[in-house]
């Protein structure tokens, strides 16, 4: 007989799903796919099943990191209105259950990556999850205003892992993708921190606007935005992307600088930069895939 799933069961499933930080997972997964596709169009090949498994493992590993982060940050999540609706502060999931859930997903994702893909990808995935869950969440976030800068490396690993899943090595191309996300992270999160500086201060988190003030934060946002703009052109200069990427990256970068300058002039416009930065990363990495596909297609025709 079929058993009807109760409303309580569905709410529990939704709560566990929320622990994974699905919006973050979607962006992480997309950047990982970009790394894998770029490796493929660069002449490296791997079985489709292993590549698909790698992307799945990266998504699960990212979700595990999100769950472990929510476990450790449950005290400050309850203080901040932006995070107070998360499953643990709401009492939908116990801290112990969240911890076990995160650790199990972490172990399974790394083990499957090791068995079905390759050792390098498994090592990189384990480092990325550890970096975010322990180095950033436990040691950096509550201790230094540079938490986002140093901790930003965790979110920059996925395209490198995607590349390694196909190529089985770390190429210059994947390092540039890593650097793009690394430099994207500070202006993205500091824009949000400008909006919620009062809540961060109340929670005891030394975000840059809290420790150094609004003016210094706006200057840092602008500086990192300039560095991001320059770095986004590197793929074309290093000849692993073509003219299509160059044109789109240049335009996207100019718009990013426009929003960053607006924030520098008026911090109240910080959320426009925050929302655009998410769109920026999706479009930039999307055009990586498009450009690589177009270049390969043209090469076959010539």
Swiss-Prot record:
UniProt lists the gene as: ctaB
EC number(s) given by UniProt: 2.5.1.141
Metabolic or biological pathway, per its Swiss-Prot or TrEMBL entry: Porphyrin-containing compound metabolism; heme O biosynthesis; heme O from protoheme: step 1/1
GO annotation, cellular component aspect: plasma membrane
**What family does the Swiss-Prot or TrEMBL record give for this protein?**
Belongs to the UbiA prenyltransferase family. Protoheme IX farnesyltransferase subfamily.
Q: Which UniProt keywords apply?
A: Cell inner membrane, Cell membrane, Heme biosynthesis, Membrane, Transferase, Transmembrane, Transmembrane helix
Please give the superkingdom of this protein's source. Bacteria
Please state what the protein is called: Protoheme IX farnesyltransferase
Say which species the protein is native to. Neorickettsia sennetsu (strain ATCC VR-367 / Miyayama) (Ehrlichia sennetsu)
């Amino acid at each position: 007989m079929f058993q009807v799933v109760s409303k309580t069961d569905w709410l529990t499933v939704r709560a566990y799903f929320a622990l994974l930080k699905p919006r973050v997972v979607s962006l992480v997964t997309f950047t990982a796919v970009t790394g894998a596709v770029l490796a493929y169009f660069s002449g490296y090949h791997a079985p489709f099943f292993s590549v698909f498994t790698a992307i799945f493992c990266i998504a699960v590993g990212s979700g595990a990191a999100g769950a472990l982060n929510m476990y450790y940050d449950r005290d400050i999540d309850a203080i901040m209105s932006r995070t107070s609706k998360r499953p643990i502060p709401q009492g939908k999931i116990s801290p112990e259950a969240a911890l076990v859930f995160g650790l199990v997903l972490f172990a399974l994702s790394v083990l499957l990556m090791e068995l079905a893909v390759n050792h390098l990808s498994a090592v990189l995935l384990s480092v990325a999850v550890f970096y975010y869950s322990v180095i950033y969440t436990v040691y950096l976030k509550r201790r230094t205003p540079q938490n986002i800068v140093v901790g930003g490396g965790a979110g920059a690993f996925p395209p490198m892992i995607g590349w390694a899943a196909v190529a089985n090595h770390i190429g210059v191309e994947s390092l540039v993708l890593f650097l793009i996300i690394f430099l994207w992270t500070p202006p993205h999160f500091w824009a949000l921190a400008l909006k919620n500086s009062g809540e961060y201060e109340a929670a005891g988190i030394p975000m840059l606007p809290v420790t150094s003030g609004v003016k210094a934060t706006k200057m840092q946002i602008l500086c990192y935005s300039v560095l991001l703009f320059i770095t986004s052109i590197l793929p074309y200069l290093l000849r692993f992307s073509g003219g299509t990427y160059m044109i789109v990256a240049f335009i996207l970068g100019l718009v990013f600088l426009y929003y960053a300058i607006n924030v520098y002039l008026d911090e109240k416009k910080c959320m426009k930069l925050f929302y655009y930065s998410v769109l920026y990363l999706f479009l930039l990495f999307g055009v990586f895939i498009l450009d690589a596909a177009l270049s390969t297609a043209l090469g076959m025709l010539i």
